[in-house]
Swiss-Prot record:
It comes from Bartonella bacilliformis (strain ATCC 35685 / KC583 / Herrer 020/F12,63). It catalyses: tRNA(Phe) + L-phenylalanine + ATP = L-phenylalanyl-tRNA(Phe) + AMP + diphosphate + H(+). Its cofactor is Mg(2+). Belongs to the class-II aminoacyl-tRNA synthetase family. Phe-tRNA synthetase alpha subunit type 1 subfamily. Mg(2+) binds at E260. This is Phenylalanine--tRNA ligase alpha subunit. Binds 2 magnesium ions per tetramer. Gene3D superfamilies: Bira Bifunctional Protein, Domain 2 (3.30.930.10). Its EC number is 6.1.1.20. Tetramer of two alpha and two beta subunits. GO terms for cellular component: cytoplasm.
Amino acid sequence: MSDIERLEQEIFLALEAACDEQELEAVRVAALGKKGSISERLKALGNISADERLKVGPALNELKKRILELLAQKRDIFKRQATALRLSKERVDVTLPVRSSPVERGRIHPISQVIDELIAIYADMGFSIAEGPDIETDYYNFTALNFPEGHPAREMHDTFFFSEDATGNRKVLRTHTSPVQIRVMEKKQAPIRIIIPGKTYRMDSDATHSPMFHQVEGLVIDKTSNIAHMMWLHETFCKAFFEVPSVKMRFRPSFFPFTEPSMEVDIQCDRSGSEVKFGEGHDWLEILGCGMVHPQVLKNVGFDPDEYQGFAWGMGIDRIAMLKYGMPDLRAFFDADLRWLDHYGFRCFDISTLFSRLGNV
């Protein structure tokens, strides 16, 4: 056994026998300190022949490297052991005592509640949920939906545009959830039955409008769906959502670039008192816009308008939440006021279903 091998064995046995940081440091100093066994041998390399130096030097450096690695491993073990010991001795119970009568404090935001109600109603009628990006291209937000160049919706004062990219194109914050209709029709074959709840953005702000608001749109595409089906769908939805046995509706001619014919739908109500009552009275409130999908929109996504048809509609989630639950100012929805949420919010464990009151408060 050479001198270096014997030295290696001694040092490694000492390292293995070290029981704490103090003993480990003593081994380090004895081996690698200023007057340590390895340090002294490295200093003495100049006193031996060149041939021996070529053998002994690398061997000593390799031994020094292995010792440092083992030292680091042992230190890590000691640190983890010390931490575990300290935690076992210094354990603190950070939990609060349970209230004698637990009180529900959290509340579901009215927007989240209404979205759940919408999903429950439309899912019961066979619709699935679709989603898409908030940041859209001009094509999906306008062109594919039959918005011509120069349409007012393309103006800067109505739409949030991003800066132009290297190709001169600008993306937008979507002004409606209609782009998702295009994306779904590009990927799926008929029949299609979807609703698309989500955030939309327009330059508008007052008591009944917000620059960011929530909208739900729906789309039905097949070979036979017609206006009669669309009218039945809206009537069924309004009865379920506003929780009334019957409701009168009127369909007024309107214009949307992506539907033809287009209509706006009003619902019968009574606004004579402090709150709006649906299914009775002599007043009318606009509730949504709808129409048969424009043939050009079908062509844009590869559907043959001579074979396929369908209808689409959209309504403001914030608006119908205000109408149903009597909230006067849309801006309060987004003020993060816990007092407002405590008043208008919903209990966390109330689940929207068609077998109980949807808006159980």
